[in-house]
């Protein structure tokens, strides 16, 4: 019997827990009536109701590992064109192009003696004139050089004093007008093309009765252009057949 108590007492003590703290180990009540009586409420074994209500229903754990990459989304719309890029380096030299067509024949060259051949002269139109002034002119009027010496092509009209172009090209003109003075005045003579002054000359009467006004021009003319000499004040001397005042011109080459 004693041996049985020795074996049961430790087992009963461990199973009773904290609810049997008021019992004395080894008593007859502990052994004979372990379940008798009313158990006192245990404050240690009963949790606080307010504390249980304040606790969260779950506790957040540590951050997990990164997941696997997802699948690629659909292709987006094209973006706006970007600005032009910098100029690249020069490329390699290309292949030579095809040979062009033959050009027109050139002008005749010089002959063995170094002179211009007769064929060259035949390609230039024969246009030239030279005329002198017979009568006196004064004031503001076109000088009519009526003493005609040369008029190749008949492009100069002595009745109007004007040269009229019929072949476009480069022309040379020169004029010399003698002033009739003696009264202390001056004379101005202008070379005009279609009412526009292209050259001017002046003669002044200082201590002498006569003085010259002269000038020269090279002009490009179109068909219908007119060239003439006009007084812009003063008196021009005409010398019968002496040709003190003259007007001349010729074509250099046609277009």
Swiss-Prot record:
It is found in: Secreted. The keyword Heme does not apply. InterPro entries: C1q_dom (IPR001073), Cerebellin_Synaptic_Org (IPR050822), Collagen (IPR008160), Tumour_necrosis_fac-like_dom (IPR008983). Highly expressed in adipose tissue, with expression levels at least 2 orders of magnitude higher than in other tissues, including brain and kidney. Residues 1-20 form the signal peptide. One of its GO terms (biological process) is neurotransmitter receptor localization to postsynaptic specialization membrane. GO terms for cellular component: collagen trimer; glutamatergic synapse; hippocampal mossy fiber to CA3 synapse; synaptic cleft. This is Complement C1q-like protein 3. The gene is C1QL3.
């Amino acid at each position: 019997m004693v041996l049985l108590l020795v074996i049961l007492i430790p087992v009963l003590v461990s199973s009773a827990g904290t609810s049997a703290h008021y019992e004395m180990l080894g008593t007859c009540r502990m052994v004979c009536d372990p379940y008798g009586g009313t158990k006192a409420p245990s404050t240690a074994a009963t949790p606080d109701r307010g504390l249980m209500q304040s606790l969260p229903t779950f506790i957040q754990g540590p951050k997990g590992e990164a997941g696997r990459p997802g699948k690629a989304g659909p292709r987006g719309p094209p973006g706006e064109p970007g600005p032009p890029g910098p100029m690249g380096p020069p490329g390699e030299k290309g292949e030579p192009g095809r040979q062009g067509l033959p050009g027109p024949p050139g002008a005749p060259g010089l002959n063995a003696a170094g002179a211009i051949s007769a064929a060259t002269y035949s390609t230039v139109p024969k246009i030239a004139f030279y005329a002198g002034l017979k009568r006196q002119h004064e004031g503001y009027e076109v000088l009519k050089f009526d003493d005609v010496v040369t008029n190749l092509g008949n492009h100069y009209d002595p009745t109007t004093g004007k040269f009229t172009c019929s072949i476009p090209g480069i022309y040379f003109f020169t004029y010399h007008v003698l002033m009739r003075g003696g009264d202390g005045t001056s004379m101005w003579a202008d070379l005009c093309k279609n009412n526009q002054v292209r050259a001017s000359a002046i003669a002044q009467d200082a201590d002498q009765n006569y003085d010259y006004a002269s000038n020269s021009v090279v002009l490009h003319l179109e068909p219908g252009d007119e060239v003439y000499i006009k007084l812009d004040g003063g008196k021009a001397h005409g010398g019968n057949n002496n040709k003190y005042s003259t007007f001349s011109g010729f074509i250099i080459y046609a277009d």
